[in-house]
């Protein structure tokens, strides 16, 4: 039987918004021009102690600006739109859906240094399922911003919960933070793990154990 598609309409903070210290979005009122961004890179090169006009660095400001457009492309995405179509005809399936080992890279909002890792997402469908690739796209939409791992974990779970209205969502994120490896304490290879649960996963510890077991199975 052909799957039945349905579009969902849910209003969450716009992708052009940024978070305040409280976690609530704050409108970005003015975006600098590309020329201003490139000038800022030249200033940083000089501050680091090098000459932005030497041959190897002459085109670096343009390259950095182009790279940042891709690296921080999540600001131009609305994660709720990624999930706005569901397959309602799933032949009675109502058990857990798990997508694990979703690779991502993000940037620490404190030092603008990368943190790199994997996300694991599970949910119990209530009225339909989304394409599996959509969950990976939601991870990317939030990861490609200035972030903390804790906030990103909560954003992923809360968005899936708000849009799909499942019986529960579980998200685990594990990552290595280069700000910890390259500066400060300088401890490479240290992993940070964060989790966020909603619905049955939050209410029932056995469901949390099941999720964690499935994530770790055959590793």
Curated annotation (Swiss-Prot):
Domain of life: Bacteria
Region ranges (Disordered): 1-37
Keyword Zinc part of the UniProt annotation: yes
One GO cellular component term noted in the UniProt record for this chain: cytoplasm
Pfam families: GTP_cyclohydroI
Keywords: GTP-binding, Hydrolase, Metal-binding, Nucleotide-binding, One-carbon metabolism, Zinc
Residues that bind Zn(2+): 108, 111, 179
Pathway assigned to this chain's UniProt record: Cofactor biosynthesis; 7,8-dihydroneopterin triphosphate biosynthesis; 7,8-dihydroneopterin triphosphate from GTP: step 1/1
Residue stretches of biased makeup (Basic and acidic residues): 14-37
Cysteine pairings via disulfide bonds: none
Gene Ontology MF, one: GTP binding
InterPro entries according to UniProt: GTP-CH-I_C/QueF (IPR043133), GTP-CH-I_N (IPR043134), GTP_CycHdrlase_I (IPR001474), GTP_CycHdrlase_I_CS (IPR018234), GTP_CycHdrlase_I_dom (IPR020602)
Annotated catalysed reactions: GTP + H2O = 7,8-dihydroneopterin 3'-triphosphate + formate + H(+)
The enzyme's E.C. designation: 3.5.4.16
Entry-linked PROSITE patterns: GTP_CYCLOHYDROL_1_1
Biological process annotations from GO: one-carbon metabolic process; tetrahydrobiopterin biosynthetic process; tetrahydrofolate biosynthetic process
Assembly and interaction partners: Homomer.
Family: Belongs to the GTP cyclohydrolase I family.
Full protein name: GTP cyclohydrolase 1
């Amino acid at each position: 039987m052909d799957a039945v598609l349905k579009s969902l309409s849910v209003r969450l903070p716009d992708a052009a918004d940024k978070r305040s210290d409280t976690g609530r979005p704050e409108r970005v009122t003015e975006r600098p021009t590309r020329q201003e961004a490139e000038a800022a890179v030249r200033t940083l090169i000089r501050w680091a102690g090098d000459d932005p006009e030497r041959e190897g660095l002459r085109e670096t400001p343009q390259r950095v600006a182009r790279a940042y457009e891709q690296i921080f492309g999540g600001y131009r995405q609305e994660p709720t739109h990624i999930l706005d179509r569901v397959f309602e005809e799933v032949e009675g399936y109502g058990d857990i859906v798990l997508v694990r080992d979703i690779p991502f890279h993000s940037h620490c909002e404190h030092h603008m240094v990368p943190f790199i890792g994997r996300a694991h997402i599970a949910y119990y469908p209530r009225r339909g399922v989304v394409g599996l690739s959509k969950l990976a796209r939601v991870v990317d939409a939030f990861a490609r911003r200035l972030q903390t791992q804790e906030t990103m974990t909560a954003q992923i779970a809360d968005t899936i919960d708000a849009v799909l209205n499942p019986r529960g969502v579980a998200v685990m994120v594990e990552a290595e933070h280069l700000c910890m490896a390259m500066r400060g304490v300088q401890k490479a290879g240290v992993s940070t793990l964060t989790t966020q649960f909603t619905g049955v996963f939050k209410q029932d510890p056995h469901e949390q154990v099941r999720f964690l077991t499935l994530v770790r199975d055959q590793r």
